[in-house]
Design a protein with these regions (language model features):
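Alpha/beta-hydrolase superfamily serine-hydrolase fold, recognizing
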Residues: 1-186
Length: 186
């Protein structure tokens, strides 16, 4: 981010605050930066907005792949190991060692009372980022008192493609967050 801010300044666009956002894997990265890296950010992060970004990796949430079943624990460890870059074994699930191993790739595990405000959208028929994982993130933000809005697209898969009204509300809320958390200078 330092390089982005420096290059923008060089081109005549001073950056003195930012919002960060993304979708799918980009949403995962946006959440990680927002919850994990804001203390080191060269400029303040006003809020994060994302859609369908994976935020946690618990086998019981990934039942759409059958990874919640005891006989699939080795497959779950393999998939989550690839996704997080961690060396995982089935016996780690449900332990503090598992959380520690996947923390660098799991935005959920970085949520604190100091997390930035969040606008997020998830889909109940998503086969890429299981909806159950988003419920954990919504709950963590609520439990920590973090201002957030969670939009649920009840007819869509990974792309919010069947819930245009929900998607419109999501985008309108992003605009409201801009006004609230990053108002233009007078």
């Amino acid at each position: 981010m330092d390089a982005v801010v420096a290059e923008a300044a060089k081109l005549g666009y001073p950056v003195n605050e930012m919002a960060i956002g993304g979708g799918s894997a980009g949403g995962c990265l946006a959440l990680l930066y927002a919850y994990r890296d804001t203390a080191e950010s060269p400029v303040p992060v006003g809020f994060v907005f994302e859609a369908v970004g994976p935020s946690s990796f618990y086998p019981e949430d990934w039942d759409n792949y059958g990874l919640d079943k005891p006989e699939a624990q080795a497959e779950a460890a393999g998939l989550f190991g690839v996704m997080t870059g961690a060396k995982l074994t089935p016996d780690m699930f449900g332990t503090p060692a598992y959380d520690a191993a996947v923390k660098d790739a799991s935005a959920l595990l970085w949520v604190t009372k100091d997390a930035v405000p969040t606008v997020m959208a998830y889909c109940t028929h998503d086969t890429m980022q299981p909806f159950k994982a988003s419920v954990r993130l919504d709950r963590a933000l609520t439990e920590n008192g973090v201002p957030h809005d969670c939009f649920v697209a009840e007819h869509s898969g990974h792309g919010l493609q069947n819930d245009s009204a929900v998607y419109r509300q999501y985008l309108e809320t992003v605009l409201e967050y801009l006004k609230t958390y990053m108002p233009p200078e007078s």
